[in-house]
């Protein structure tokens, strides 16, 4: 395809949702190096995706819109939506592509942009677009969007998300790194917005103590709302740990994760961010979620999997058509990785921290991070 000046990409949701699209966005950048890539996203995208961090050149915030940008405390404004679409039509996009759902909501959105070519995912009941592939839920999210990018001949050799940690991110955590005095540290990210993806908080204190006994400093990460919960975990430890919850920006968090020798987390945004800065990870996954959200490589990433399928409250096996569905009268609000043992997580961590061949990989990565030149 020639003379492509502007490509709009719709992905207006959360951190992990965006990060898994990065290989596809990189494919678009590689294939169309002179094209402006514009993300139609949320306010956090505009704050985080500053110049140089990803292949995205510009972010335009999408107004609150059912099925596109859902906000708990936000309401739709039809006048704002109309003004948005008029503005987007004046952009004269050559291609509008969506990486968001099965097309029921996203396809009508794309068509209102009046782009020369519309591309994305679709299902039988969705509004038609120019080029599409069928949406089937159970698929690696990374590979899903690479398939979509392939509809405009975009290709890449990179199948793991990648972002750049910038100088301003390094500067933000300089005091923390000075305090640690170059001691190797492991990051634990214990909580998740969706409790069903979170490991039992009580497991983190003994895990953190084990890491301390092995010679690693321990940093906990999370949102400001999770700070108290992390304080409670630390209060049950025999050793000291650092609570960074709510104390850094998303860029600062990326810098912390990049400097860690290992990140241990449930299936949530910071785990995907750690992958994107090339830090070894131990991720705790419910088996159905691993299909979509797990890493594609294993050299420095180890998933620990829960195979416990049934909800203990109602007995339903909630994995069809999506994870945690159907709900009926039960929302299955309990951890679905609760049966993962501390021993299993330790074994996965040991495989990355202490085996000689993995240690060499860690040392190479570690020496190239913010510590040093």
What do these predicted ranges mean?
Residues 1-373:
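Catalytic machinery of carbohydrate-active enzymes
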């Amino acid at each position: 395809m020639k003379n492509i000046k502007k490509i709009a990409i719709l992905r207006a949701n959360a951190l992990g949702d965006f990060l898994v699209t990065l290989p596809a966005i990189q494919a678009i950048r590689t294939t169309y190096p002179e094209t402006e890539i514009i993300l139609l996203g949320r306010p956090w995208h505009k704050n985080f995706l500053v110049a140089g961090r990803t292949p995205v050149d510009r972010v335009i915030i999408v107004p609150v819109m059912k099925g596109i940008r859902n906000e708990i405390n936000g309401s739709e404004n039809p006048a704002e939506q109309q003004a948005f679409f008029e503005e987007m039509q004046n952009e004269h996009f050559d291609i509008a592509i969506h990486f968001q759902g099965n097309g029921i909501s996203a396809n009508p959105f794309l068509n209102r942009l009046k782009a020369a070519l519309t591309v994305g995912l679709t299902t039988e009941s969705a509004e038609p677009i120019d080029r599409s592939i069928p949406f089937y839920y159970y698929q690696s999210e990374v590979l899903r969007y690479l398939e979509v990018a392939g509809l405009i001949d975009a290709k890449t050799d990179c199948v793991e998300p990648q972002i750049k940690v910038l100088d301003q991110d390094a500067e933000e955590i300089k005091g923390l790194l000075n305090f640690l005095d170059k001691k190797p540290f492991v990051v634990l990210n214990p909580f998740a917005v969706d409790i069903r993806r979170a490991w039992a908080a009580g497991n983190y204190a003994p895990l953190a103590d084990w890491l301390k006994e092995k010679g690693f400093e321990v940093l906990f990460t999370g949102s400001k709302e999770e700070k108290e919960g992390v304080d409670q975990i630390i209060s049950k430890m025999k050793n000291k740990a650092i609570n960074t919850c709510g104390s850094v920006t998303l860029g600062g968090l990326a810098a912390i994760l990049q400097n860690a020798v290992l990140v241990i987390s449930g299936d949530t945004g910071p785990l995907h961010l750690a992958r994107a800065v090339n830090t070894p990870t131990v991720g705790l996954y419910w088996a159905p979620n691993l299909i979509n959200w797990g890493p594609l490589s294993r050299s420095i990433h180890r998933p620990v999997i829960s195979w416990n399928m049934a909800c203990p409250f109602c007995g339903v096996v909630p994995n069809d058509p999506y994870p945690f569905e159907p709900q009926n009268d039960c929302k299955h609000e309990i951890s679905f990785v609760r049966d993962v043992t501390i021993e299993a997580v330790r074994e996965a961590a040991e495989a990355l921290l202490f085996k000689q061949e993995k240690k060499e990989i860690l040392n190479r990565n570690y020496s190239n991070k913010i510590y040093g030149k």
